[in-house]
Regions:
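Class I (Rossmann-like) S-adenosyl-L-methionine-dependent methyltransferase catalytic domain
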Residues: 1-73, 82-132, 152-157, 173-237
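Conserved acidic residues
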Residues: 74, 141
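Conserved beta-strand/loop positions that form the S-adenosyl-L-methionine
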Residues: 79
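A conserved beta-strand element that flanks and buttresses the S-adenosyl-L-methionine
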Residues: 144
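Short catalytic micro-motifs in class I SAM-dependent methyltransferases
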Residues: 147-148
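A short glycine-rich, Lys/Arg-flanked "PGG" loop and its adjoining helix->strand segment in the class I
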Residues: 158-170
């Protein structure tokens, strides 16, 4: 797989282009260590204090491997990967990592440090949105997308599912999470993310299995965490 780390995300002519750009800028700011200019009432929120302290991200990050742990030599596509290769136990799993990310800053960090960490497992990172997976058909044993669907409407995720199906090997797993709008943290976190520059969509959790079914797949199981529900999805061969 090729590695791309461009300086700027190109304009996206799709209906979701503006939101894609907004999410990219929001994470460029964070990964680049740039300060956010937020109103005092937001900075006084407990969720903001936890975020600044570094305790929020570990709480809300979905441990997808509790549902399907990557196997040795599995080819795994991590959509919206951030810097996951640098912080998750990919070396322990001995799985092959291909990243897909819209933040140029995150892509640059992975491109610089991934090969140093493990050049055999790190297969590169492509800068691009989740609805454009330009890989060879049936390339991956598993695809992962955590912390991504919450920023987009359901019709966007239908397109992502179509793209994932093309690049998964027959019988491969797709693991994605969706925000639980009933979670205590959901509304405060959505407010914080909006002020950080990326609007969050609080969709009813019942919409996701129906969406998956409409794209010819099925939800095999789910697992709830503090903020997100993880969906374990498969297309039957």
């Amino acid at each position: 797989m090729k590695s791309e780390a461009k300086g700027r995300l190109p304009a996206d002519p799709s209906p979701w282009g503006a939101q894609v750009q907004a999410v990219g800028r929001r994470y460029d700011h964070e990964f680049g260590g740039q300060p956010f200019d937020l109103p005092p009432e937001v900075e006084e929120m407990a969720v903001f204090q936890d975020w600044i302290a570094g305790s929020l991200t570990p709480r809300i990050s979905t441990p997808f491997w509790e549902s399907v742990k990557p196997r040795k030599r599995d080819r795994c596509l991590d959509i919206g990967c951030g810097i996951s290769f640098l912080i998750y136990p990919w070396r322990e799993w001995e799985a092959l990592f291909q990243g897909h990310e819209i933040s140029p800053v995150a892509c640059a960090a992975l491109t610089a440090r991934g090969p140093q960490l493990n050049s055999k497992l790190f297969k590169g990172v492509t800068q691009g949105p989740a609805h454009r997976l330009e890989y060879e058909p049936q390339s991956f044993d598993m695809a992962i997308a955590t912390g991504v669907s919450c920023y987009y409407p359901p019709d966007y995720w239908a397109t992502v599912l179509q793209q994932v199906k093309k690049v998964l090997k027959p019988g491969g797993w797709f693991l994605f999470d969706a925000i639980n709008p009933e979670a205590e943290l959901a509304e405060p976190w959505a407010i914080l993310e909006t002020y950080l520059g990326a609007e969050v969509h609080l969709e009813d959790l019942s919409r996701w299995p129906a969406l998956v079914k409409a794209e010819g797949a099925r939800v095999v199981s789910t697992k709830d965490y503090e903020l997100f529900r993880l969906f374990k999805v498969k297309w039957d061969v």
